[in-house]
Amino acid sequence: MELITKEESKTNYEYGCDPYNRPIGELLKNGIVVIDKPSGPTSHEVSAWVRDILKLKLAGHGGTLDPKVTGVLPVALENTSKCISVWHMIPKEYVCLMHLHRDTEEEELLKIFKKFTGRIFQRPPLKAAVKRSLRIRKIYELELLEKDGRDVLFRVRCQSGTYIRTLAEDMGEALGTSAHMQELRRIVSGPFTEKDIVYLQDLTDAYIFWKENGDETELRKIIKPMEYGLQHINKIIVKDSAVDAICHGANVYLNGVSKLSKGIGADETVLIETLKGEAIGIGTALLNTKNVLKESKNEEDNREKYKEPIVDIERIFMSPNTYPKMWKKKK
């Protein structure tokens, strides 16, 4: 992600911390564990097991997987649960084993894959926990991996909220027959991939080893900082002097900005970070990158507009007083 410097600024290492060097106690409360969800338990049960293994008060999952579905399940630990809403709308990727109910040529199958790539209509299945109204979902990629008789293995990258079971059934109908999903595995969920996953037993062993031997090496390999799960979002990096004000609920103003992502659009959700890379919170950008830089050049000529916020803060991750107070209350 390319960053543009608005104003060079240095950070003071007497407060705050590089996210990847947080003390293990802080990491446990501001971290993410990406579990390889087994077939059988619900996503909620897996999250509860992670919470209990790590002796935490709270753990929540991002992107529910049905009990029989396996694969990438990001679990947010305590304070990181505030990030879950950001994960809900990110694209997902699956590998699905579909069984067709009649013989089909590979060429015919590829034509259907092409037809179902792009915007499609879906109605949630009967067992879905949402209203069964017709909705539009986007299929970004459909790739045939293997075909053995009537069994078809394919990879799909899709918009969040896409029902793969329904997709398989609809493709079968388009082929002039019927089809059903036999197995499903999630391999990507936004920034999380199969390279990040661990088994519940590995997590248990690493935690026990830390508690009994004081060695946190393996536990650190498993628990990722909160910021790892926010790397897909465009960001605005603020000066140390602006951090505590934002932690107390202030919006982001132009004079507090040091750097920002190149491609920020107006009304886009953006991450607010410190110069050390710590997540402060998220908000809605009120100006795009081009206009932020334009306002910076004109700040002397346009003081009134300069006083307007450029980001409307929606959710704060960082605790107040992590950085010293460097702001004054209006009289």
Curated annotation (Swiss-Prot):
What the entry lists under Gene3D superfamilies is as follows: Pseudouridine synthase (3.30.2350.10), PUA domain (2.30.130.10)
The record ties this protein, via InterPro entries, to: Dyskerin-like (IPR012960), PsdUridine_synth_cat_dom_sf (IPR020103), PsdUridine_synth_N (IPR002501), PUA (IPR002478), PUA-like_sf (IPR015947), PUA_sf (IPR036974), tRNA_PsdUridine_synth_B_fam (IPR004802), TruB_arch (IPR026326)
One of this protein's GO BP terms? mRNA pseudouridine synthesis
Q: What are the protein's UniProt keywords?
A: Isomerase, tRNA processing
Active-site residue list: D66
Example GO molecular function: RNA binding
From which domain of life does this come?
Archaea
In this protein, which residues make up the domain named PUA? 233-307
Q: Which reaction does it catalyse?
A: uridine(55) in tRNA = pseudouridine(55) in tRNA
Judged by the first EC level, this protein's enzyme class is isomerase
Which Enzyme Commission numbers does its entry carry? 5.4.99.25
- Family classification: Belongs to the pseudouridine synthase TruB family. Type 2 subfamily.
Q: Which PANTHER family match?
A: CENTROMERE/MICROTUBULE BINDING PROTEIN CBF5, H_ACA RIBONUCLEOPROTEIN COMPLEX SUBUNIT DKC1
Q: What does this protein do?
A: Could be responsible for synthesis of pseudouridine from uracil-55 in the psi GC loop of transfer RNAs.
Q: What is this protein called?
A: Probable tRNA pseudouridine synthase B
Record lineage: Archaea, Methanobacteriati, Methanobacteriota, Methanomada group, Methanococci
